[in-house]
Every structure is written in structure tokens, then in C-alpha cells.
């Protein structure tokens, strides 16, 4: 694997003091804006995870769990004064916080914050093992995920846990424990969907034990869901929650919300009129929404397929890692609705990309990849979601989407021009 220190001067031994300064600066920022607020408040998605687990331990009827009004009433009954909902989570999400249900909401949040800190350290260690980077470089790399990491702490989210599952699964593969890797990805996919794309990546590389074990894990969790929650709840989830979610439609949330930073939201703003949310689209042509999504999806899929074909045609020594990298980045680019903490998951594919490409002469492309990754982490410090846009100004409303597009393009370009891919 390429030495990360040679790729970016910041990570050279000559810049050790600068690395230490960056580590202290990013750590202090994360603690002040993320960890301390997490310790002192119960907000955003944590109540949704916690209350769903409490309902499970209390034997509540889960048939109403996707009724936002009913779920909000349960949140208030537990002394939490905020709006919440269980949608769009799969039923299995209720299992995650079961160990914390004996505690009060604030105590449970504090315990989960400590767990997240431990998970951050574990992810740094796994990243170092996978990439061969120094520990301080791995730590800085994860801290550069910025607001995504901070909001994972603040909101009591699960994405450090999911990143841990993904990194550990890849580590298992490198240790030739493919079945364990698949089982981990399957368990992760039962709660959050992204790990499914990595199961597909292993299947493309004919690493059959990993996707087979992953699918068994998914089917096993699904069977448990049906037994515990009932088939009606699962059918409702599939038809009324999952399918609308894949189209960027989430209950009690505006489908035009700029905060989603997705192609779905962008094309809605450009093409689809709405009296309240989008009275004057750039081009009033409702069919353009579907056509635009189809074109982008086909382009991303085509370029991803081309990059993977090239890796396999030239028998690239790191084709599995680079396949997973490009699939992961493509999946993040096409997500129908995103939040800051989702982009913690970018750490895995971007780290694979940077550490496994062989041509050390492509400094500018590598710098662009790392720069895009860091910019995605901090771009939401700009309050672009609060501004009003009209006409062509709507193009300025989606900076994270454009940064993701740049990252994807740089990844494709770098793989295409990797001069040491024929070995």
C-alpha cells in the first residue's frame, strides 16, 4: 500500500508537529461542539432509538410505531420535550438501545456518548491496521469528517458504530475470515442500508462466502423482526417507509429540504413546482425530475462499472479494495436523502482509495480527493440551508452534493490513470 506520508506533505514526518497541532485543534473542536452538548442534552434521533427500545421492553404494541403522532406521545410520556419519529428506521433499529433502557434518557445518552468515544478510538485503530498509516494520521483523517462526526456525538447517532462494523468486516477479510465479515455487514445492513453495497462488491469479486453470510444475517434478523414485531409491521415498513425513503420522501419532512443535499432534492427544486415549498421552479417540467434522476443514476453506475472493469481487466493488485472504494463513494453520491452524520461512512471508501492506489505521481488527484473529503465534513458550517434562492441561484444551494460529485469524479479519474495498475 502507498505510504500516506508521501502522498500529502501534511502527513510527512517533517510535519509531525503540524499533525499534532491539527489533532489537538480538531479534537478540541469536536469535544466543544459535539461531545459536551451530547453529555448535557437528549435531542434529535437519540430519543427515537431509545424510546423504540423502551417500548420493546414494555411490551407495547408496535403496530403504531410508524404513526408519528403516537410515537411523539410516547416520547413525551418519557419526559422528553421534542418532536420525534421512528420512520424511516427498520424495525430492527429498536434492538440497538435495549441495554440502555434501564436508565433515564439523559443517563442513557451519556452512556452512549462514552460508547461513541470508545468507538471513535476503535475506528482509528482499525483504520491504521487497514491502511498502514500512522495512528495520528488515522485519527486526523477521521476527525476531518468534521460536522458529521460532531453531529454523531450530539445527536446520539449510530454511524460510528456502523463505521466500526464496516471497518471490522474489511479487517476480517484481510485476515481471511470472510464469513465473519459477511455476518457483520449483514447485521449492519439490517439497521442501516449502506453495508449492502459492500456485500455486492464482494460478490462481484467472487468472494462468495462474505455475501452469502451477509444475506443469511439479513434474513435471520428479518425473521426475528417478524416474530417480535409481527408481519403487519414489517409489511408496512416495506411498503410505506422503505420504498418512499428510496425516493427521498420521509414522513413529516419536506421533500424539498435543501439540507438533504441529494440529487432527488436538487431535481425537485429544478423541475417540480409546489405551492408551499417550490412555487417557482427553475424549469417547470415535472417529468424532468424522473428523467434527471435516471440520467444521473445511469451515469454514476456506468462510470462505476467502467472503473471496476478496468481494475479487473488489468488485474490490479488491489482491485477488491478499490472496487469497494468506488462502490461506496457512488452509493453515497446517490443516497436519496442525506444528513451530516451519514458522511462519517465516507471514511472507509476514501481511506481505501487513498491507501491502495499505486501511482504516487498523481499528487493533485489525491489532494483533490482528500480535500473534497474534508470539505464535505465542514461545508455545513456555511448556513446555506437558511438562505433563499431563486432561479439559477438554486445551483448554489447544494455545495455538499457538488463536493460529492467532485470526489466521485476524482476517484474515477485516479483509477483510470493509475499507471501501476498493470502488474
Regions found by a protein language model. Give the residues of each.
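Short, intrinsically disordered terminal tails adjacent to the first/last structured region
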Residues: 1-11, 414-423
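Primarily membrane-embedded glycan-assembly and transfer machineries that use lipid-linked glycans
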Residues: 2-180, 205-327, 332-333, 339-340
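Aromatic-enriched
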Residues: 28, 352-423
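Hydrophobic transmembrane alpha-helices
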Residues: 104, 192-195, 349
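Transmembrane alpha-helices and membrane-interface helical segments
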Residues: 122-126, 164-175, 201-206, 210, ...
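A cytosolic-side transmembrane-helix exit/cap motif
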Residues: 159-162, 182-185, 232-241, 363-370, ...
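Membrane-interface alpha helices of multi-pass inner-membrane proteins
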Residues: 179-203, 327-334
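Hydrophobic/aromatic-rich transmembrane helices and adjacent perimembrane loops
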Residues: 339-354, 399
Amino acid at each position: 500500500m502507498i505510504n500516506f506520508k508521501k502522498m500529502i506533505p501534511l502527513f510527512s514526518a517533517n510535519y509531525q508537529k503540524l499533525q499534532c497541532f491539527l489533532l489537538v485543534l480538531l479534537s478540541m473542536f469536536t469535544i466543544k461542539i459535539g461531545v459536551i452538548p451530547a453529555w448535557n442534552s437528549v435531542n434529535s434521533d437519540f430519543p427515537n432509538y431509545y424510546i423504540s427500545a423502551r417500548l420493546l421492553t414494555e411490551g407495547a404494541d408496535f403496530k403504531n410505531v410508524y404513526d408519528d403522532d403516537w410515537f411523539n406521545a410516547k416520547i413525551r410520556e418519557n419526559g422528553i420535550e421534542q418532536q420525534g419519529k421512528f420512520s424511516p428506521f427498520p424495525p430492527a433499529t429498536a434492538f440497538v438501545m435495549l441495554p440502555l433502557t434501564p436508565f433515564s434518557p439523559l443517563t442513557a445518552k451519556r452512556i452512549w456518548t462514552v460508547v461513541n468515544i470508545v468507538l471513535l478510538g476503535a475506528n482509528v485503530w482499525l483504520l491504521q491496521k487497514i491502511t498502514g498509516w500512522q495512528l495520528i494520521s488515522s485519527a486526523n483523517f477521521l476527525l476531518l469528517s468534521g460536522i458529521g462526526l460532531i453531529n454523531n456525538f450530539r445527536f446520539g447517532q449510530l454511524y460510528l458504530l456502523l463505521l466500526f462494523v464496516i471497518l471490522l468486516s474489511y479487517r476480517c477479510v484481510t485476515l481471511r475470515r470472510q464469513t465473519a465479515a459477511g455476518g457483520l455487514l449483514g447485521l449492519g445492513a439490517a439497521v442501516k442500508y449502506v453495508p449492502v453495497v459492500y456485500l455486492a462488491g464482494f460478490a462481484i469479486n467472487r468472494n462468495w462466502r462474505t455475501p452469502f453470510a451477509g444475506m443469511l444475517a439479513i434474513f435471520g434478523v428479518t425473521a426475528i423482526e417478524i416474530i417480535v414485531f409481527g408481519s403487519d409491521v414489517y409489511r408496512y415498513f416495506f411498503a410505506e417507509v422503505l420504498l418512499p425513503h428510496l425516493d427521498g420522501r420521509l414522513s413529516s419532512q419536506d421533500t424539498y429540504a435543501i439540507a438533504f443535499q441529494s440529487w432527488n432534492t436538487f431535481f425537485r427544486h429544478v423541475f417540480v413546482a409546489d405551492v408551499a415549498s417550490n412555487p417557482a421552479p427553475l424549469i417547470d417540467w415535472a417529468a424532468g425530475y424522473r428523467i434527471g434522476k435516471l440520467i444521473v443514476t445511469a451515469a454514476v453506475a456506468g462510470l462505476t462499472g467502467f472503473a471496476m472493469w478496468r481494475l479487473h481487466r488489468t488485474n490490479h493488485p488491489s482491485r477488491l479494495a478499490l472496487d469497494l472504494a468506488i462502490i461506496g463513494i457512488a452509493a453515497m453520491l446517490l443516497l436519496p436523502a442525506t444528513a451530516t452524520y451519514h458522511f462519517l461512512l465516507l471514511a472507509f471508501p476514501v481511506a481505501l482509495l487513498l491507501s491502495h492506489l499505486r501511482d504516487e505521481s498523481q499528487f493533485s488527484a489525491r489532494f483533490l480527493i482528500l480535500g473534497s473529503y474534508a470539505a464535505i465534513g465542514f461545508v455545513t458550517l456555511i448556513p446555506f440551508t437558511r438562505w433563499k434562492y431563486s432561479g439559477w441561484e438554486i445551483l448554489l444551494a447544494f455545495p455538499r452534493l457538488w463536493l460529492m460529485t467532485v470526489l466521485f469524479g476524482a476517484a474515477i479519474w485516479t483509477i483510470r490513470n493509475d499507471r501501476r495498475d498493470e502488474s
